[in-house]
């Protein structure tokens, strides 16, 4: 998700991702999706990890649009797509300013943060959280910005 620096209740951003859909007759295929989206929590969005500051939103969008979807490659999935997109952003000098795009760090922090939120009952309704907001971790500041 690419969103504004300062969020308001009705802020929107753009969601970029590789999505798997069933094929008529069996099997599935991957396709790229770009959607304007709310920044509010959804059932498909567990956590957000802020990895960089956008310098040129158009350039970020072009990189996302041009990150390939790899049909028929065993083991390839949306996580592999994110990894490749971040690697492309990392070597580009126009899209992002300050950023942390080292895949092993981003992946490990995201997994650990999601587990921490699960342990705190963020997703099962037992905790005391504002469920309208997605829990967010700022990797640049190394701190949680939305619980």
Q: Residues of each region from the PLM?
A:
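Activation targets extended, charge/polar-rich intrinsically disordered C-terminal tails
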Residues: 65-147
């Amino acid at each position: 998700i690419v969103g504004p620096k300062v969020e308001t209740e009705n802020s929107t951003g753009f969601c970029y991702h590789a999505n798997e859909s069933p094929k008529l007759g069996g099997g599935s295929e991957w396709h790229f999706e770009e959607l304007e989206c709310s920044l509010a929590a959804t059932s498909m969005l567990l956590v957000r990890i802020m990895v960089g500051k956008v310098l040129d939103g158009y350039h970020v969008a072009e990189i996302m649009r041009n990150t390939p979807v790899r049909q028929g490659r065993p083991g390839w999935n949306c996580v592999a797509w994110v990894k490749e997109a971040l690697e492309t952003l990392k070597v580009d000098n126009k899209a992002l300013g300050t950023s942390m795009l080292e895949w092993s760090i981003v992946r490990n922090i995201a997994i650990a943060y999601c587990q921490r939120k699960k342990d705190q009952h963020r997703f099962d309704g037992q905790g005391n959280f504002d469920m309208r907001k997605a829990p967010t971790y700022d990797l640049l500041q190394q701190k949680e910005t939305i619980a």
